[in-house]
């Protein structure tokens, strides 16, 4: 449930593509044209989502695994993730180690 402008909107988890920290809020990027702002922490929302479906790729980003279109090596051991909407995020070294074993190699071979 997302609260916006005095209304409560139900955003199905199946529509959520990624979540990004934005100060004291989280931007929920779904199939809507613009992200919804939720007053919560990214960690709190991550606890409520299926970890097999949503991956923590950076301290500021959580991404639906199926929304990742491309995985490419980047500078200093980081990895660049290109999403299906054309946006790009960095998979930091810190969070790369938390991914399921073999996931990164499997994605790179797709």
Predicted features by range, described:
Residues 1-90, 107-110:
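Conserved binding/recognition cores within well-folded domains
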Residues 94-110:
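C-terminal output/interaction extensions
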